[in-house]
């Protein structure tokens, strides 16, 4: 075990990074190799063999996809690098969002034969949302069809990025031997089988001319980033290695450029220069603006600098239930210092908690430490109420960092224990899982008494059911997947609700006149409440009760009992009784008025529409498209990428159940697809009638 004190590097020598990628770009292998060359890993893990470090849940080992973002720490040239592994599958985009929120920078890994693939666009846009600086790694340069410059070009066409290649490959496909560093103008070759020994040599004569041309292209792009350097460049002066790196670093941190490197992680080539680039171009916590929060007492905006003397502030970005030590709460420290055994205040929940132990994680091993400082990513033991997105802080100076927004689930499944004995275990297990994953919702259907789980897609729920069996030993039976329909209105309507009860003694009196109107989808709001009463016809203290009554009525719409969305409720008028009026009476009156107005407002059913991207060999395309047409899909684009076709379509979720099996048989297993939620849309009348009948 190394000396723990040695683990605390100066803040400028700390890098918190994520590795983001499309599902098969080779992200896990890249992470593995990083851990191997930084000396934390004693054998080379290989995803295809199922023994990698970051993919450590059994389901991931079988499926070869990364689901849980495990935080890992390693050292390189005196710098400490914390890596958050982010999942590349669309059903887990919430997990990606959460990881990006706490990162300072990222490596985007691409497959050099494909460049930007559909899922990489989604992850890239999420990284844009949180202004995460990134460098790009074109992986799989040894694969048939690898084309470095084509892949770089897709960063421009698909992502509108400003890529600046700082390397050029030596050969490609089976002849890929190494890289040329365009800043130093040296060739780098990997000498040993495991890639741990590499050496710099002079650039081979036959590549010299191309290397000079590529360096010129790089210098031109670097010069455009800085006026002083541009002048030097135009006057033909020499630009030093330090200057190039300084300008590139600044531009990367400001999200104005993306340095691009290449390699073949599986063939153990290109990883050490990638680690150098993490240090050269990605920010330390000191390079980024202070984190913004809201003071609990008055809602004023406050900023916290990455300084040990500031009050403690941290954000919880992951909760895992560890079979041995119970609940592990992963957090990122933004300011201040926290010792193990001390108390911390959860400002989101308004409760103080004691953190009994603090651990630094190495994918699935852990190392205990006495305290954490700004920039640290650690996991705490003993925090009972803390959940993802919560702020942990100093009780004397409480702040709330912004909440992380998670998308609404679109698919539901009824689930029941296989035996009586599983009943209690199921409740506990679902509680633990929904605590870990905010996009998993669990509720009990009032009418049928069934337990319903809802999530982001079929794969998401399959994995939940799988984990119930595997981790919690609960056997369950599941129903057919159900679409999370919604209801809304097409025109404004008014209605009145009066609730009057006169039974000996005190009565009940509530009277509300409401108008409801549709909220256009582009406003992105599901509900708005406006009080337009004048002259105190309804005292202000009853307004929250009226709003609560409306919200309760919205949980079950008039057509088929689905939740109501995109409705603005305006209280126009009403009356009250000095003695008999109560919150309860107004809540009921508001609910009555809302239900009445809904009936008049031309209610319609909405269904989730998914964005579907299918990659297929050309010969199956005809069958795939005619099948899509039979599923009410709208084809949006057809693209050719190499010998493959990419079909992009919007399709109702209800038409996609079991699609994996259908696509497999249509393409003899050669086509693949990814799917993610796009928007809600009105259900065609004929289909709506059938849905309403069933209910």
Curated annotation (Swiss-Prot):
Stored Pfam families: EF-G_D2, EFG_C, EFG_III, EFG_IV, GTP_EFTU
Residues covered by the tr-type G domain: 12-286
PROSITE patterns given in the database record: G_TR_1, G_TR_2
GO BP, sorted A to Z: ribosome disassembly
Subcellular location: Cytoplasm
InterPro entries according to UniProt: EF-G-like_DII, EFG_II, EFG_III, EFG_III/V, EFG_IV, EFG_V, EFG_V-like, G_TR_CS
Keywords per UniProt: Cytoplasm, Elongation factor, GTP-binding, Nucleotide-binding, Protein biosynthesis
Family statement drawn from the similarity comment of this UniProt entry: Belongs to the TRAFAC class translation factor GTPase superfamily. Classic translation factor GTPase family. EF-G/EF-2 subfamily.
HAMAP family, per database record: EF_G_EF_2_B
Its job: Catalyzes the GTP-dependent ribosomal translocation step during translation elongation. During this step, the ribosome changes from the pre-translocational (PRE) to the post-translocational (POST) state as the newly formed A-site-bound peptidyl-tRNA and P-site-bound deacylated tRNA move to the P and E sites, respectively. Catalyzes the coordinated movement of the two tRNA molecules, the mRNA and conformational changes in the ribosome.
Record's protein name: Elongation factor G
Originating organism: Thermotoga petrophila (strain ATCC BAA-488 / DSM 13995 / JCM 10881 / RKU-1)
Lineage: Bacteria, Thermotogati, Thermotogota, Thermotogae, Thermotogales
Name of the coding gene: fusA
């Amino acid at each position: 075990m190394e000396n723990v004190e040695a683990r605390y590097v100066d803040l400028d020598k700390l890098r918190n990074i994520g590795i983001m990628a499309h599902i098969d770009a080779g992200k896990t292998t890249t992470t593995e190799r990083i851990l191997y060359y930084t000396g934390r890993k004693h054998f080379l893990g290989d995803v295809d063999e199922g023994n990698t470090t970051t993919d450590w849940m059994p389901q991931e080992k079988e499926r070869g996809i990364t689901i849980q973002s495990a935080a890992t720490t390693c050292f390189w040239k005196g710098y400490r690098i914390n890596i958050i592994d982010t999942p590349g599958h669309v059903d887990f985009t919430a997990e990606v969002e959460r990881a990006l929120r706490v990162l300072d920078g990222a490596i985007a890994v691409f497959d050099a034969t494909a460049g930007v693939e559909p899922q990489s666009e989604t992850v890239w846009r999420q990284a844009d949302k949180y202004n995460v600086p990134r460098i790009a790694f074109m992986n799989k340069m040894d694969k048939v069809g690898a084309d470095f410059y084509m892949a770089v070009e897709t960063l421009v066409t698909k992502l509108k990025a400003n890529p600046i290649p700082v390397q050029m490959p030596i050969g490609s496909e089976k002849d890929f031997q190494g890289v040329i560093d365009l800043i130093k103008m040296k060739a780098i070759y990997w000498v040993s089988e495991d890639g741990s020994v590499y050496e710099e040599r002079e650039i081979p004569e036959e590549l010299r001319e191309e290397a000079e041309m590529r360096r010129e292209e790089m210098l031109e792009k670097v010069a455009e980033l800085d006026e002083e350097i541009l002048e030097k460049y135009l006057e033909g002066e020499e630009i030093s290695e330090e200057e190039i790196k300084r300008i590139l670093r600044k531009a990367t941190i400001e999200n104005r450029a993306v340095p691009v490197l290449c390699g073949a992680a599986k063939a153990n080539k290109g990883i050490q220069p990638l680690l150098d680039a993490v240090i050269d171009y990605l920010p330390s916590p000191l390079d980024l603006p202070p984190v913004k929060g809201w003071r609990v007492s008055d809602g004023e905006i406050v900023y916290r600098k990455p300084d040990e003397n500031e009050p403690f502030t941290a954000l919880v970005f992951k909760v895992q239930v560890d079979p041995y030590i119970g609940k592990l709460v992963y957090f990122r420290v933004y300011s201040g210092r926290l010792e193990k055994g001390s108390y911390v205040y959860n400002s989101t929940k308004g409760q103080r908690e004691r953190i009994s132990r603090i651990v630094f994680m190495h994918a699935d091993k852990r190392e205990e430490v006495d305290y954490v400082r700004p920039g640290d990513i650690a996991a705490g033991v003993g925090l009972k109420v803390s959940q993802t997105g919560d702020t942990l802080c100093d009780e004397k100076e409480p702040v709330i960092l912004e909440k992380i927004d998670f998308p609404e689930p679109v698919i539901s499944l009824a689930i029941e224990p296989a035996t009586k004995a599983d009943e209690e275990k199921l409740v506990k297990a679902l509680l633990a899982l929904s605590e870990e994953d905010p996009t998993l919702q669990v509720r009990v259907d009032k009418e049928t008494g069934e337990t319903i789980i809802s999530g982001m897609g079929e794969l998401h729920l399959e994995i939940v059911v799988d984990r119930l069996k595997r981790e919690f030993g609960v056997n369950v039976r599941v129903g057919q997947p159900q679409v999370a329909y919604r209801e809304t209105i097409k025109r404004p309507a008014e209605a009145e609700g009066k609730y009057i009860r006169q039974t000996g003694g005190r009565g009940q009196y509530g009277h509300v006149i409401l108008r409801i109107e549709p909220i256009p989808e582009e406003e992105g709001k599901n509900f708005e409440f406006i009080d337009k009463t004048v002259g105190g016809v309804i005292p202000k203290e009853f307004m929250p009760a009226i709003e609560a009554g409306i919200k309760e009525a919205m949980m079950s719409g008039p057509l088929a009992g689905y939740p109501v969305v995109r409705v603005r409720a305006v209280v126009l008028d009403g009356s009250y009784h000095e003695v008999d009026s109560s919150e309860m009476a107004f809540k009921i009156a508001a609910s009555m008025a809302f239900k009445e107005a809904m009936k008049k407002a031309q209610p319609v059913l909405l269904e989730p529409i998914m964005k579907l991207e299918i990659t297929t060999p050309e010969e199956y395309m005809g069958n795939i498209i005619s099948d899509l047409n039979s599923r009410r899909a709208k084809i949006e684009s057809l693209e050719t990428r190499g010998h493959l076709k990419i079909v992009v379509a919007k399709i109702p979720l209800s038409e996609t159940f079991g699609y994996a099996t259908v696509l497999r048989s249509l393409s003899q297993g050669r086509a693949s697809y990814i799917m993610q939620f796009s928007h809600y849309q009105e259900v065609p009348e004929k289909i709506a009638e059938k849905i309403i009948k069933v209910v």
